[in-house]
Amino acid sequence: MVEAVKVSELVKDVPSLKIIEGKEYLSQKLIDTSDISRPGLELTGYFDFYPKNRIQLLGRTEISYSARLDHDLRERVFNKMATPETPCFIVSRGLPIPSEMLEAAEKEKIPVFSSNMATTHLSSVITQFLDEKLAPRKSIHGVLVEIYGMGVLIIGNSGVGKSETALDLVKRGHRLIADDRVDVYQKDDKTVVGEAPKILKHLMEIRGIGIIDVMNLFGAGAVKDSTEIQLIICLQNWDPKANYDRLGFNEKTREIFEVDVPQVTVPVKVGRNLAIIIEVAAMNFRAKKMGYDASQKFEQNLTELISDNSKKDEGESKK
């Protein structure tokens, strides 16, 4: 988990932010929460629960109210808002920035930004960026590919053929996100997202060949930066004694950051086309999400067949 994000990183990701004051402090100021403060009560002088460590975002309401205050009161208010813990001030909608805010920010070495975006939209963009940056993170050994728009994480023991299978899937028109190591973070209560570490982005290791650049070989359409992990495929070496699920009734899940992700175990055996099997597994999972379950259809057909045979047996016994 990233403990804090530099304000300079926020500026790079939200291009609508224009620096007005404190450019030299961008790398010094840190943001440790995705919550954003809209200092309304503070403008009236009420600071009992002022969240000083949050980004201070002022929109039309805050700026118009501050304009009604006299100079001395406005100066006192902005001096109290500007603390060493405050990451930055942002004024939306391209509104004029009070000179008292600029002076207070300069004293405490706080960057001040202006943006033409609407306040609510700007708040949403910043929150989304900070949620991703500050989210809990961990690395998983595996390969992440996007199959028909669905993120599929392929895991298994080293040497089982994860990268080779992913390469076959890329050749079939699907997209690589990460090979060997997948960095995973929790986006919300029901969503986990995977991406590649910067050093491994768009690269794959194929035994006997070495490192290959997937984007260079197959084009930009063969790669993607990140995707939601919706299905996990666990590759296992074939064990004749193992009892593999043949009908699809036993649905299993794997927990990632308290999010249960469906998992399918695929036994690896010479002659099995793993790429096609995984492709079909992804399509079958999507069909289940849309309400069609082939295993339930089979069970229904079997029940009807047994019922029909029972009726025939009853009819023959009466004769």
From Swiss-Prot:
Cofactors, names only: Mg(2+)
EC number of the protein: 2.7.11.-, 2.7.4.-
Binding-site residues, Mg(2+): S163, E205
Keywords per UniProt: ATP-binding, Carbohydrate metabolism, Kinase, Magnesium, Metal-binding, Multifunctional enzyme, Nucleotide-binding, Serine/threonine-protein kinase, Transferase
Region annotation (Important for the catalytic mechanism of both phosphorylation and dephosphorylation) ranges: 204-213
Disulfide linkage: none
GO molecular function, one term: ATP binding
Alphabetical list of InterPro entries matching this protein: HPr(Ser)_kin/Pase (IPR003755), Hpr_kin/Pase_C (IPR011104), Hpr_kin/Pase_Hpr_N (IPR011126), P-loop_NTPase (IPR027417), Ser_kin/Pase_Hpr-like_N_sf (IPR028979)
One GO BP annotation of this record: regulation of carbohydrate metabolic process
Catalytic activity line of the entry: [HPr protein]-L-serine + ATP = [HPr protein]-O-phospho-L-serine + ADP + H(+); [HPr protein]-O-phospho-L-serine + phosphate + H(+) = [HPr protein]-L-serine + diphosphate
Family: Belongs to the HPrK/P family.
Subunit structure: Homohexamer.
Function: Catalyzes the ATP- as well as the pyrophosphate-dependent phosphorylation of a specific serine residue in HPr, a phosphocarrier protein of the phosphoenolpyruvate-dependent sugar phosphotransferase system (PTS). HprK/P also catalyzes the pyrophosphate-producing, inorganic phosphate-dependent dephosphorylation (phosphorolysis) of seryl-phosphorylated HPr (P-Ser-HPr).
Note: Both phosphorylation and phosphorolysis are carried out by the same active site and suggest a common mechanism for both reactions.
HAMAP family: HPr_kinase
Domain notes: The Walker A ATP-binding motif also binds Pi and PPi.
Name used for this protein in its record: HPr kinase/phosphorylase
Species whose genome carries this gene: Lactobacillus gasseri (strain ATCC 33323 / DSM 20243 / BCRC 14619 / CIP 102991 / JCM 1131 / KCTC 3163 / NCIMB 11718 / NCTC 13722 / AM63)
Lineage, broadest ranks: Bacteria, Bacillati, Bacillota, Bacilli, Lactobacillales
Gene name linked to the record: hprK
